[in-house]
């Protein structure tokens, strides 16, 4: 196949998808600057991981949880095979961008014989270091004929994993635990969907032991109507503790004539009372624009599951899935994000009421 360049009578062969991605990055960088606030900046080498990088057969690689362990960046990547089933595989890098060392086989494979909720795979991990446990807690989606649900696992080295089992009934996903307790309770953000529900909202729940969860609250509502986050919303990476509050990056979905469109927005929660929403962006802040975000197994998707804050310089690295087909990287400055949120409206505080179900 050949591509004719507009500025040249010659034709140039398309070498591979990566070269197209690089050219697209250059074209995007040369566009007239947006008049909107642009805080998230794509890495010029995007996508940083694809199935072509994998040491064993894989259909797609995307939606990676992320953490910093010493001098090493660790991604726990969702890998989908040609059956459509997913597992999780560890990739390690010294700079968080290149020279990834990828496990030679699945690091966290479904175990349907012992955990029937994983019959169709394990997906979309979020990683949280919980200091009082001295371990990483992985919140992931277990998928089976009963529907998706939230399960937890723990690890200290990303070589061995201990399952804590399912903690929410179907249908539920987009979960992550907070890194510390509130009083004597752990807290978790997640996104349940009930039969006949009018929308898919972000919820907050509490637990004394990471096993038994209750005191459920709706944290953020899908806004319906013409809003960019009208139809459903869900947590993206885990909550990030900042001096100003818990920083939340969430995805919002709007149903369009061309299908579902996933974009990202921001919120800020009170440090000591995470049920209290201090700020929420009215505008989306990051959306599918590049070919690797707009075209893939699921078109029009940017879906972060992990981010890493460099406390020395305030830089945030956001690792996201592009079109359910690759792993990409964007960066932002924490000060810019918090500064923007301070200009956003404070949402009305609803009367808090503990819930026993998600109806």
Which positions does each model-derived feature cover?
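Beta-rich carbohydrate-recognition and catalytic domains
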Residues: 2-7, 17-120, 129-176, 180-231, ...
């Amino acid at each position: 196949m050949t591509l004719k360049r507009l500025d040249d009578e010659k034709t140039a062969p398309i070498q591979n998808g990566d070269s197209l991605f690089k050219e697209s990055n250059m074209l995007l960088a040369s566009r007239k600057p947006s008049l909107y606030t642009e805080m998230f900046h794509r890495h010029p080498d995007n996508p940083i991981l694809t199935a072509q990088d994998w040491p064993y057969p894989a259909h797609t690689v995307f939606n990676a949880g992320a953490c910093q362990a010493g001098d090493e960046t660790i991604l726990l990547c969702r890998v989908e095979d040609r059956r459509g089933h997913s597992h999780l595989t560890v990739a390690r890098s010294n700079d968080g961008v290149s020279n990834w060392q990828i496990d030679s086989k699945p690091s966290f494979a479904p175990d349907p014989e012992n955990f029937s909720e994983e019959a169709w795979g394990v997906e979309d991990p979020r990683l949280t270091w919980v200091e009082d446990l001295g371990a990483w807690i992985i919140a992931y989606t277990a998928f089976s004929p009963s529907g998706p649900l939230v399960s937890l696992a723990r690890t200290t080295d990303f070589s061995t994993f201990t399952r804590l089992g399912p903690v929410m009934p179907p249908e539920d996903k987009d979960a992550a635990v907070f890194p510390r307790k509130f009083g004597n309770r752990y807290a978790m953000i997640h996104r349940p969907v009930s039969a006949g529900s009018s929308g898919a909202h972000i919820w907050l729940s509490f637990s004394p032991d990471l096993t038994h969860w209750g005191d459920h609250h709706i944290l953020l509502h899908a806004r319906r109507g013409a809003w960019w986050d009208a139809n459903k919303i869900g947590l993206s990476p885990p909550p990030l503790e900042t001096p100003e509050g818990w920083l939340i990056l969430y995805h919002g979905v709007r149903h369009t004539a061309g299908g579902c469109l996933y974009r990202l927005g921001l919120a800020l929660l009170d440090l000591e009372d995470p049920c209290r929403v201090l700020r929420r962006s009215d505008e989306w802040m990051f959306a599918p624009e590049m070919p690797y975000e707009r075209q893939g197994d699921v078109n029009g998707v940017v879906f972060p599951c992990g981010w890493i804050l460099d406390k020395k310089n305030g830089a945030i690295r956001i690792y996201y899935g592009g079109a359910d087909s690759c792993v990409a990287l964007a960066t932002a400055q924490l000060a810019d994000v918090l500064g923007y949120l301070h200009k956003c409206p404070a949402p009305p505080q609803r009367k808090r009421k503990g819930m026993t179900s998600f109806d």
